């Protein structure tokens, strides 16, 4: 049996493109290998729009464990709409060799919190916690001074500093008296019965006074550190927001093997650019509130390789593709207000974007019907960003994931006429863990979608797809594991439009 339904395959391909557009972690676009295995000369440009809605509640306990999470204030939609462009072209040099070049945007994030909740504004509860910690420290040291606000903190510092100054003056006087008594005793040992008790008493008093002055000095230092942190945190304004973007340029060379040229191996280099900004605000992030980080644009290199089995007469195609991880040695500029001047600096760190494996399959069921299936694996559990200043202060990663992500999709397409084909698909994304980072609080998704392709001419066609995403409920956590939010019953839409050219 032989039947040509390549136009139908393209309709399903457009739908598949939008299916990956809000996957786990920072995943935004699939590998371009699907286009490289098209027949003949093929070129395309596509525009993808992601429109998620992710709302929830913050933690009324500010930051604690999942066991005693208490739903607090509303967190309005924190996921910004995101749009990106992909394009590429491939050509057959002869019946054996193919070449292609592709641009896609594989990793991205666009997050911006708003409203009145723990992800927005000055971290007043965190500042209050600093005052409480300072008061507890004084109490443990046997110093009875209240510290519940900035004024009382300054009063405590001034009071203890005055006591330290007075104590040091008494120590200086006692040391002078001790030196005089010791000199008198040395000059006239007969005075020992009188001077020895005095010298002993002075030495004991000096020892006790030295301990008290040292304790007071340490208390002033500790309180001054708390004061600096609280003052810096009190200047924090705005809302938590994150922006990460990437661009991939991939060149592929393919060779067909076998008597019928139905096995193709392909591979080539990838050039990837990565940049981003992170801004943490509000009580949720504890003393990291106010943290800013800028990831300067970096270009690094990787590779892609795969193997495909092709049987065009029944529209059969099975392809396994691997895209390598890529190490970016980026300059990251940080500002952690709680540390004052020590929290500002620029350092080089390595960010490794993850590898991925795609399995794509399609086959014609009859002359007008196409079955597709695909799976994708991304080891997000290996991914982490640990800035130098943030990591040194906390000992933690800024962003990381607990689980690897698996996605799967099954679709059917139907050719209605020589010009028009439609398709539908159902998909699943496992997500990358739950609880998960507060910068992407969903646990995967189930999705359904529709796609269509219309042939404008025998070579030119326009395709479109729309997909509805039902996000899994997730608890949001910060790097120390504290649960800071609960996000339930969220969804999203993804839209894709593609213009393509194909000449066999």
Outline where the language-model segments fall.
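N-terminal, post-signal peptide beta-strand-biased segments of exported outer-membrane/organellar beta-barrel
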Residues: 2-141
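Outer-membrane beta-barrel porins/channels
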Residues: 93-96, 104, 108-504
């Amino acid at each position: 049996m032989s039947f040509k339904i390549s136009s139908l395959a393209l309709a399903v391909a457009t739908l598949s493109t939008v299916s990956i557009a809000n996957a786990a972690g920072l995943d935004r676009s699939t590998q371009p290998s699907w286009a490289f295995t098209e027949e003949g000369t093929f070129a395309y440009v596509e525009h993808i729009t992601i429109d998620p809605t992710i709302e929830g509640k913050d933690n009324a306990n500010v930051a604690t464990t999942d066991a005693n999470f208490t739903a607090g204030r509303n967190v309005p939609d924190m996921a910004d709409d995101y749009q990106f462009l992909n394009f590429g072209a491939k050509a057959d040099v002869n019946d054996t060799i193919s070449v292609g070049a592709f641009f896609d945007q594989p990793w991205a994030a666009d997050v911006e919190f708003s409203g009145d909740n723990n992800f927005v504004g000055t971290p007043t509860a965190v500042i209050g916690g600093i005052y409480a910690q300072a008061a507890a420290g004084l109490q443990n040291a046997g110093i009875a001074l209240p510290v519940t606000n900035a004024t009382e903190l300054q009063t405590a510092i001034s009071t203890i500093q005055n006591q330290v100054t007075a104590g040091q003056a008494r120590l200086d006087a006692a040391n002078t008296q001790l030196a005089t008594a010791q000199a008198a005793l040395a000059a006239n040992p007969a005075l020992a019965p009188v001077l020895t008790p005095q010298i002993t008493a002075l030495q004991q008093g000096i020892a006790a006074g030295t301990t008290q002055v040292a304790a007071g000095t340490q208390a002033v230092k500790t309180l001054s550190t708390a004061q600096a942190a609280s003052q810096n945190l009190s200047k924090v304004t705005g809302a938590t927001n994150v922006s990460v973007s990437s661009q991939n340029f991939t060149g592929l060379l393919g060779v067909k093997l076998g008597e019928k040229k139905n096995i193709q191996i392909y591979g080539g280099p990838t050039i990837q650019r990565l940049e981003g900004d992170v801004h943490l605000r509000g009580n949720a992030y504890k003393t990291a509130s106010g943290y800013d980080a800028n990831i300067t644009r970096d270009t690094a290199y990787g590779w892609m390789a795969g193997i495909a089995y092709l049987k065009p007469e029944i529209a059969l195609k099975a392809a396994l593709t691997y895209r390598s991880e890529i190490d970016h040695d980026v300059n990251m500029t940080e500002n952690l207000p709680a540390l004052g001047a020590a929290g500002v600096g620029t350092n080089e760190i390595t960010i490794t974007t993850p590898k991925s494996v795609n399995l794509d399959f399609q086959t014609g069921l009859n002359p007008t019907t196409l079955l597709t299936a695909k799976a994708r694996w991304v080891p997000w559990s290996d991914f982490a960003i640990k800035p130098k200043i943030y990591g040194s202060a906390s000992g933690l990663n800024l962003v990381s994931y607990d689980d690897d992500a698996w996605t799967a999709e099954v679709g059917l397409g139907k050719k209605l006429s020589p010009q028009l084909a439609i398709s539908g698909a159902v998909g699943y994304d496992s997500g990358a863990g739950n609880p998960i980072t507060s910068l992407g609080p969903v646990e995967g998704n189930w999705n359904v979608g529709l796609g269509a392709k219309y042939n404008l001419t025998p070579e030119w066609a326009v395709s479109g797809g729309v997909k509805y995403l039902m996000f899994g409920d997730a608890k949001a956590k910060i790097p120390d594991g504290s649960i800071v939010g609960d996000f339930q019953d969220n969804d999203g839409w993804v839209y894709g439009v593609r213009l393509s050219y194909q000449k066999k």
